[in-house]
Amino acid sequence: MDMEWNPGFTIRVTVDHGAVLLSANRAGLRSLSAQLAALAEETPGAHIHYDEHNALEEGSTELIVEIRP
């Protein structure tokens, strides 16, 4: 799956009191929406890893999104 990012994207994922907060600017949300739409076309078990080394802001919590059957 091709991971494309809109210019200037920022995305942060944090966990606070058991709640996951995903916050992003417009470019980040557009990037995520395109990637999630592409993931929806994959086979069950396909997944995307997001972390501070490939997409998220420094200090973010790793996020894995997976498609289920």
Regions found by a protein language model. Give the residues of each.
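Positively charged, low-complexity terminal tracts
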Residues: M1-P69
